[in-house]
A protein has these predicted regions:
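Active-site Tyr-X1-5-Lys
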Residues: 157-187
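Amphipathic terminal alpha-helices
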Residues: 34, 316-319, 323-369
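N-terminal Rossmann/SDR dinucleotide-binding element
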Residues: 1-90, 94, 369
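Mid/C-terminal beta-alpha module of Rossmann-like enzyme folds, strongest
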Residues: 241-316, 335, 355-369
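NAD(P)-dependent short-chain dehydrogenase/reductase
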Residues: 145, 175-227, 231-244, 269
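Conserved Rossmann-fold NAD(P)-dependent oxidoreductase catalytic core, especially the SDR/UDP-sugar
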Residues: 93, 101-108, 112-165
Length: 369
C-alpha cells in the first residue's frame, strides 16, 4: 500500500487531490502536512476545507489525527524529524505561497523550505515518486506561443511576479541538490474553478474575468486565448502521475493545450449566457494600463467598496498575464492516458452561479493574501 505525504491539503489544489483520493477510495495511507497548533486543530482545518468540496462525512471520517503531520514549510526543521516520514513512498507537493502580492514568505516557503523538504525526502529509502507541483508560467513564455515542456532554466528570465520566479528556481535547485530523488514535476497552467462545484472551493482567479467584463475594457484583446483548467481535472492528472509505475518524462504540463484553450470572446459569451445578460462584445476596448489608472476614481462606482490601489495592482498583474496569449502543450499528459480537458466555457456557468452575491473585492482576497 502507498504511503502518501500530501502537502497543501488545506488549499484549493491539494484539497481537490484529497477529494479525488477519498471519493475513489484509493488504497493509500495518508500523511497530511498541516499548519496548526496541535493535531486536533490540524484535522479540523483539513475537514473544513474538504467540506467546501461537499465530501460526505463518512468519507471524511477516514482522515483522523493519526494522518496529521504538524508542520509548516516556512519552518521545515520542526517536522522533518517525524519518524513517519521514513515510511513515505509517494509525495504530492501542492503546498506553496501562491500569492501574486509581495508576501515575504514566498521565497522562504517556495524555495528554502521546499528544498529542505526535498533533501529530507531524498534520504527516504522507499520513496518511489516526489511529485512537485510547479506552474506552467514559471518558464517565462514568449507571447502568442504554444509552449512545450522544458527542463531548461534561464537564470535571467523576466518574471512578472516573484511567485513564478520562486517556482522556476526551486525546480532547478531540486534537480541540482537531489539528483538521485525520483522527481517528477507537474506544471499546471491557470487553475480556475471546479467542473462540478464551480468556485465553491475557491474563487481564485475567476474574479479577474468578471472584473475585466465589468470594466468593459482590459489590457488584452477579446481574440487573445487563455489556457485554463479546473482544479478537479488537475487533481485527476496529479493522481495519475502518482500512480503511474514508469514515466517517460520528468516534466508534464497539466493544461488546456491548443485545442481546449478559450478566447476571451468565448468567455464573454459564456459568462453573459450564465448571467442572462448581453455579452460585452463590441463595447469592449483593449486599453493600456495607464488608461486603467485614469479610471481610479470610477472603480468604487463600478465594483462597490474596494481597495483602489489593490484593484489597480491586480489589473496590472493579471492584465500582463492575459496579454501573453499563450497555450501550454499537453501532449505528454494526454499520451499517458489523461482524457482531454474540459474547456473553461464548459463549466463557467457553475463558477458564475457559485459567486453570485460576492463582490470582486471579496473574491480576490484569496489571491492577495
Amino acid at each position: 500500500m502507498k504511503t502518501l505525504l500530501l502537502t497543501g491539503a488545506t488549499g484549493f489544489l491539494g484539497g481537490a487531490v484529497l477529494e479525488k483520493l477519498l471519493i475513489e477510495n484509493q488504497s493509500v495511507n495518508y500523511l497530511l502536512l498541516v499548519r496548526a497548533d496541535n493535531a486536533q486543530q490540524g484535522l479540523a482545518r483539513i475537514r473544513a476545507n474538504m467540506e467546501k468540496f461537499n465530501i460526505d462525512a463518512n468519507l471524511l471520517s477516514k482522515i483522523t489525527i493519526e494522518n496529521i503531520l504538524l508542520g509548516d514549510l516556512s519552518e521545515p526543521a520542526d517536522f522533518l524529524t517525524d519518524a513517519r516520514i521514513n515510511n513515505v513512498t509517494h509525495v504530492i507537493n501542492c503546498a506553496a505561497v501562491a500569492s501574486f502580492g509581495n508576501n515575504p514568505l514566498i521565497w522562504k516557503v517556495n524555495v528554502e523550505g521546499t528544498l529542505a523538504f526535498a533533501e529530507r525526502m531524498a534520504q527516504v529509502p522507499g520513496l518511489k515518486r516526489f511529485l512537485h507541483v510547479g506552474t506552467a508560467m514559471s518558464c517565462s513564455p514568449e507571447p502568442g506561443s504554444l509552449v512545450a515542456e522544458s527542463g531548461e532554466f534561464e537564470e535571467d528570465a523576466e518574471h512578472l511576479v516573484e511567485y513564478t520566479r520562486s517556482k522556476s528556481t526551486i525546480e532547478q535547485l531540486m534537480r541540482q541538490r537531489c539528483p538521485q530523488m525520483p522527481l517528477t514535476i507537474a506544471r499546471p497552467s491557470i487553475v480556475v474553478g471546479h467542473t462540478r462545484l464551480g468556485c465553491q472551493p475557491s474563487s481564485s482567479i475567476f474574479w479577474v474575468f468578471g472584473m475585466a467584463l465589468m470594466l468593459r475594457k482590459f489590457m488584452c484583446s477579446l481574440q487573445d486565448n487563455i489556457d485554463v483548467i479546473p482544479a478537479d481535472y488537475c487533481a485527476d492528472a496529479l493522481v495519475m502521475l502518482m500512480n503511474s509505475e514508469t514515466l517517460e518524462n520528468d516534466v508534464y504540463h497539466i493544461s488546456a493545450g491548443e485545442e481546449s484553450s478559450v478566447s476571451f470572446a468565448e468567455i464573454d459569451n459564456a459568462m453573459a449566457a450564465a448571467l442572462e445578460k448581453a455579452p460585452v462584445g463590441d463595447e469592449y476596448a483593449q486599453v493600456t494600463y495607464d488608461a486603467l489608472v485614469k479610471m481610479r476614481r470610477q472603480l468604487k462606482d463600478i465594483f462597490g467598496p474596494c481597495n483602489e490601489r489593490l484593484m489597480l495592482k491586480a489589473m496590472r498583474l493579471y492584465g500582463s498575464f492575459a496579454m501573453l496569449n499563450v497555450r501550454f502543450s499537453n501532449e505528454k499528459i494526454l499520451k499517458l492516458g489523461m482524457p482531454k480537458p474540459p474547456r473553461f466555457t464548459d463549466y463557467i456557468a457553475g463558477c458564475v452561479q457559485s459567486t453570485r452575491g460576492l463582490s470582486i473585492q471579496q473574491q480576490m482576497v484569496v489571491d492577495f493574501k
